[in-house]
Amino acid sequence: MTRVILFPAIDLKEGRCVRLVQGDMAQAIVFSDDPAAQAASFAEQGFSWLHVVDLDGAFAGAPMNAAAVDAILAAVTIPVQLGGGIREMRTVEGWLAKGVSRVIIGTAAVRDPAFVREAARLFPGRIAVGIDAKDGRVAVEGWAKTSTVTAEELGRRFEDAGVAALIYTDIARDGVLKGLNIPMTLALAQAVSIPVIASGGLASIEDVHRILEPDCALLAGAITGRALYDGRIDPREALAAIRRAEEARRSGS
């Protein structure tokens, strides 16, 4: 079992912190007008990483919420992983130079696998691949289009590339609080040796307990968004559960 990390999500749209329903920009729920303050709050609550997505950037193909991301980076000292609109090496270099700990490449991973491999070679441990699936196929361009590539096929492409993590999102479950798609996420984790992070649908503390069960030992963590903002998950309870699981693992119980 790898160390499990619970990532609070900050999705940026027009400089504000929002949550979408199944990736639909027309169904954006605004949770905060101050993403930096939200980031600082998550850090104070004890989270060890932040997951940030530039939603406008994902659709535009280039960064669109740079000011908000800069403010987040200035507000916290915990590591930040960032996705959305990262399709060129200069964008990767720019974000890493600004202090982003890990960048997430999504659309470009499907369209230009060589770009991902080169980025992982240049920046070892700092490149993740976002695998966003709709009906088993990988979606691209802010989930507006669906490719013919399956999640497992895409993951295997980067098996020996030095990618730090694969972030698997079930689009049908994203933002609707129906629970993580554990079977599909585990299928991906079993197909590759790269750490896999689950996303999309985490709804309750029971979902946190689920990823800590022995059969989910291959999972490196999960991303939580709406459940955290809605108060369905108590951060202290969730983080305490993870600590207990790690202590039990270390003691061999």
From Swiss-Prot:
GO molecular function: 1-(5-phosphoribosyl)-5-[(5-phosphoribosylamino)methylideneamino]imidazole-4-carboxamide isomerase activity
A single BP term in Gene Ontology: L-histidine biosynthetic process
Residues forming the catalytic site: 11, 132
Membrane in keyword set: no
Keyword Kinase attributed: no
Keywords: Amino-acid biosynthesis, Cytoplasm, Histidine biosynthesis, Isomerase
EC numbers: 5.3.1.16
Cell compartments where the protein resides: Cytoplasm
Functional pathway: Amino-acid biosynthesis; L-histidine biosynthesis; L-histidine from 5-phospho-alpha-D-ribose 1-diphosphate: step 4/9
Signal peptide extent: none
Reaction equation(s) it catalyzes: 1-(5-phospho-beta-D-ribosyl)-5-[(5-phospho-beta-D-ribosylamino)methylideneamino]imidazole-4-carboxamide = 5-[(5-phospho-1-deoxy-D-ribulos-1-ylimino)methylamino]-1-(5-phospho-beta-D-ribosyl)imidazole-4-carboxamide
Pfam name, any one: His_biosynth
InterPro entries: Aldolase_TIM, His_biosynth, HisA_bact_arch, Isoase_HisA-like, Isoase_HisA-like_bact, RibuloseP-bd_barrel
Family designation: Belongs to the HisA/HisF family.
NCBIfam families assigned: 1-(5-phosphoribosyl)-5-[(5-phosphoribosylamino)methylideneamino]imidazole-4-carboxamide isomerase
Name recorded for this polypeptide: 1-(5-phosphoribosyl)-5-[(5-phosphoribosylamino)methylideneamino] imidazole-4-carboxamide isomerase
